[in-house]
């Protein structure tokens, strides 16, 4: 049996303020830090151990991982940071309050942007200061790989190369994998692992800071999965 544990980062400052966050690099709230420590404590008390961890290049996920590692006494754990695990890029909606956006554009339109599998939000302009190409952490990426806005379908297509090239081989080598990322990058993996339809995955919500345990067979097909809380 192969072990994969997925954790969405703890509450962030913009979760608290009800803002579209995406690739904006906001930090955890004190509550988010507590959620992350609690996740690590749950895993430690349940007897989980890990050989490698994966996370994004955004601080709310990285710091969540640090807290989990600290609670489990696993600060030495090898960590792979990848932009492919970043949150879905919300384009021109980045930083906007969700309620105010709904008041401006209408609830139905915002619901479509948030919950349609293959409809992107309004894209950033190339010269927008929020364009990730202006951020040094993405300097080595091809500009064509840097999104100006994404739907969940784009997010799935971004995450799967990392799964195929790194995470899946690690699992097949019997490494116990911890992955700390974001709501939509985790939903992308859930969709792939559980072979969910485009419609079904849109109804899935991933809570902050609660470990989602996948037990997989030798072909990396789910035997069972459950939240540990």
UniProtKB/Swiss-Prot annotation:
Segments traversing the membrane: none
The protein's annotated pathway: Carbohydrate degradation; glycolysis; pyruvate from D-glyceraldehyde 3-phosphate: step 3/5
E.C. number(s) listed in UniProt: 5.4.2.11
Catalytic site positions: 9, 87
Highest taxon listed in the record's lineage: Bacteria
Transition state stabilizer (site feature) positions: 182
Matching Pfam families: His_Phos_1
Residues bound to substrate: 8-15, 21-22, 60, 87-90, 98, 114-115, 183-184
Keyword Membrane among UniProt keywords: no
Catalytic activity: (2R)-2-phosphoglycerate = (2R)-3-phosphoglycerate
Assembly, per entry: Homodimer.
Family per similarity comment: Belongs to the phosphoglycerate mutase family. BPG-dependent PGAM subfamily.
Name of this protein: 2,3-bisphosphoglycerate-dependent phosphoglycerate mutase
